């Protein structure tokens, strides 16, 4: 299991939100490229970049994403946020991202099938859960699907690289990830899963590492790295124990 530092972009800055709320923002850097480079220099194998402007319907920051990708090369970068059509997915891949993270449109079976055909193993499907349902449109609306139902539908139709599971109620809280739900999603879907949301300590990472054999490939860590609650080298050591 690997640790994937998160770099969330909003209005040109590096920020973290709490529970996905645009009005609960903490700015950690005015220079996202420098922040991404810092994580790469400290040993990150992969970065998770989220374009929050795109997620909330504002113009996407493709140029900034391209700068980050170039600055951290050869570290792999996955990019999400507002990728709701084929052109948007293609744009981030052309900007150098290794994977595009798709959320809202993943509920459309035809779209998932087309993604698998056009970009095999280059797409990660975000499974964002709130109150037992999949949230969409920047985590604002709830769908009728459960996370397991979405994962099984994706497995049937698309050649995706992984699922990114986030328990929204824990995101940005540092209160611990939903280990049980993450492991269950990995086991039942048969698709590699990246855990996200709530990591606040090395114990949280160790808890995920302990069940990594269920199919948990990595964990995205945001606020805990930025506040210093955990260091990246220590987090990587804790995660590797479950590899």
Predicted regions mapped to residue ranges:
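Conserved, mostly hydrophobic/aromatic
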Residues: 8, 39, 47, 92, ...
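Catalytic cores of alpha/beta
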Residues: 72, 77-99, 111, 180-217, ...
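Charged helix-capping and loop-helix junction motifs
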Residues: 59-66, 140-149, 175-184
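Glycine-rich, proline-tolerant flexible connector loops at the mouths of alpha/beta enzymes
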Residues: 46-64, 164-174
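Short, acidic/polar
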Residues: 28-40, 84-90, 143-154
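Conserved anion-binding
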Residues: 11-23, 90, 97-171
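C-terminal helical cap(s) of enzyme catalytic domains, especially alpha/beta-barrels
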Residues: 110-118, 123, 209-212, 216-243
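Structural preference for beta-strand elements that scaffold enzyme active sites
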Residues: 2-6, 46, 74-78, 98-101, ...
């Amino acid at each position: 299991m690997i640790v994937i530092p998160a770099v969330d972009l909003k209005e040109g800055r590096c920020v973290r939100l709490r529970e996905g709320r645009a009005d609960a923002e903490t700015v950690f850097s005015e220079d996202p490229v420098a922040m991404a480079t810092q994580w790469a220099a400290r040993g990150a194998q992969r970065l998770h970049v989220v374009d929050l402007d795109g997620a909330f319907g504002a113009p996407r920051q493709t140029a900034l994403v391209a700068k980050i990708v170039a600055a951290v090369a050869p570290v792999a970068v996955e990019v999400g946020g507002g990728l709701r059509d084929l052109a948007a997915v293609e744009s981030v891949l052309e900007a150098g991202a290794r994977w595009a993270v798709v959320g809202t449109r993943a509920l459309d079976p035809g779209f998932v099938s087309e993604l698998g055909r056009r970009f095999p193993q280059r797409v990660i499907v975000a499974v964002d859960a709130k109150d037992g349902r999949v949230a969409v449109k920047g985590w604002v609306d709830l769908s009728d699907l459960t996370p397991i139902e979405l994962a099984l539908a994706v497995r049937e139709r698309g050649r995706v690289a992984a699922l990114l599971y986030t328990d929204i109620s824990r995101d940005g809280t540092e209160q611990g990830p939903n280990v049980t739900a993450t492991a269950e999603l990995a086991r039942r879907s048969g698709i590699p899963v990246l855990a996200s949301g709530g990591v606040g300590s090395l114990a949280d990472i160790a808890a995920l590492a302990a069940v990594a054999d269920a199919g948990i490939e990595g964990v995205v860590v945001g606020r805990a790295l930025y506040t210093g609650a955990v260091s990246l080298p220590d987090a990587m050591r804790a995660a590797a124990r479950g590899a």
